[in-house]
Design a protein with these regions (language model features):
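Proteins enriched for Cys/Gly/acidic motifs involved in redox and nucleic-acid/cofactor modification
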Residues: 1-203, 208
Length: 211
């Protein structure tokens, strides 16, 4: 018998804590975030939630990684070319991290749900401070807080929890449109598809929640 998906509201306790840390660090200046999204519409929707969370933590956004305090690549594992681009672009940030040690560089998305890739990132790119999988977006404030306060690298992935988290703030990229995921994951483990690995089993929002 299939387990009924549990629906929870995300824990927002760490949002004001991150805002306080960044206010102290920036001495009143607004912290900036640079988000780069690879892949499908699901990744775009995930990035909109990441931006919503960062906005509530006091961040504004920039198109220039050189100006950012927080850099995040939301990765795609469908095509090898996309993976190669991620490795190349992350490698290019090494000099920037050396110049500005306070920058926090992070990777999320489908690639990070593959153990061999997460291990490669951890070993080959020591300047990357945070790696998290697709099922950890709701924990971003806590992860960010731990990285900023403790200064330790974090890798969190492989979460098979089927809980759906509601009330995650969203910042839309467009004025008149936005992506609305109504379900996540898949129960059909096709050999060519990464979705069941990245997003686990099929689960969906309640109909009234979507409306």
């Amino acid at each position: 018998m299939q387990k009924v998906n549990e629906i929870k509201n995300m824990d927002c306790d760490f949002i004001p804590l991150v805002a306080q840390v960044m206010e102290i660090r920036k001495r009143g200046d607004v912290p900036l975030a640079y988000i780069r999204t690879y892949g499908c519409q699901q990744n775009v929707a995930d990035s909109e939630q990441v931006k919503g969370l960062l906005s509530q933590m006091g961040y504004e956004f920039t198109d220039k990684p050189d100006d950012a305090d927080f850099i995040l690549f939301n990765t795609c594992a469908v095509r090898e070319h996309a993976e190669d681009r991620v490795f190349g672009n992350v490698g290019a940030l090494k000099a920037l991290k050396r110049k500005h040690p306070s920058i926090l560089i992070a990777l999320c998305g489908c690639m990070m749900e593959q153990e061999h890739i997460a291990n490669r990132i951890y070993k080959s790119f020591p300047f990357v401070g945070l790696v998290f999988g697709t099922n950890y977006i709701h924990e971003l404030p806590q992860l960010l807080y731990n990285c900023l306060v403790n200064g330790k690298r974090l890798v969190v992935r492989g979460n098979k929890d089927t809980t759906i988290y509601e009330n995650i703030p969203t910042r839309r990229d467009g004025t008149f449109k936005g992506w609305l995921p109504i379900m996540y994951g898949c129960d059909n483990f096709c050999t060519y598809c990464i979705v069941p690995v990245s997003y686990t089993h099929l689960r969906a929002h309640e109909t009234r929640g979507n409306l």
